[in-house]
C-alpha cells in the first residue's frame, strides 16, 4: 500500500509540473536557419557549430586514416 502511495506521488509531481520557465524558441531558430546568407546549414548555428564540425571532421578523417593503416599493416606478412 505504501509503494502505491509513493508511486502516485511521483506520478503526480512529474505530470502536473508547469513548464512556464521554458519558452518556445522554434520561430527564432526557423528564422536563423532559413535565412539566405550563403552559409551551409551545419554552420548557421554560430561558432560552436563550427568547432563541432571541425572536431567531427578531424576525428572522422583520423579514424579513417588509422583504419587504413591497420588494414595495411595486417595485410603484409610478419616476421616470426
UniProtKB/Swiss-Prot annotation:
GO terms for molecular function: oxidoreductase activity. Induction: Induced in brown adipose tissue in response to cold. Pathway: Energy metabolism; oxidative phosphorylation. It is found in: Mitochondrion inner membrane. One of its GO terms (cellular component) is mitochondrion. It comes from the Eukaryota. Component of the mitochondrial respiratory complex IV (CIV, also named cytochrome c oxidase complex), the last enzyme in the mitochondrial electron transport chain which drives oxidative phosphorylation. The CIV complex is the component of the respiratory chain that catalyzes the reduction of oxygen to water. Acts as an assembly factor that specifically drives the homodimerization of CIV complexes, mediating the formation of mitochondrial respiratory supercomplexes (respirasomes) containing two CIV: supercomplxes with two molecules of CIV show improved activity. Component of the complex IV (CIV, cytochrome c oxidase), a multisubunit enzyme composed of 14 subunits. The complex is composed of a catalytic core of 3 subunits MT-CO1, MT-CO2 and MT-CO3, encoded in the mitochondrial DNA, and 11 supernumerary subunits COX4I, COX5A, COX5B, COX6A, COX6B, COX6C, COX7A, COX7B, COX7C, COX8 and NDUFA4, which are encoded in the nuclear genome. This is Cytochrome c oxidase subunit 7A1, mitochondrial.
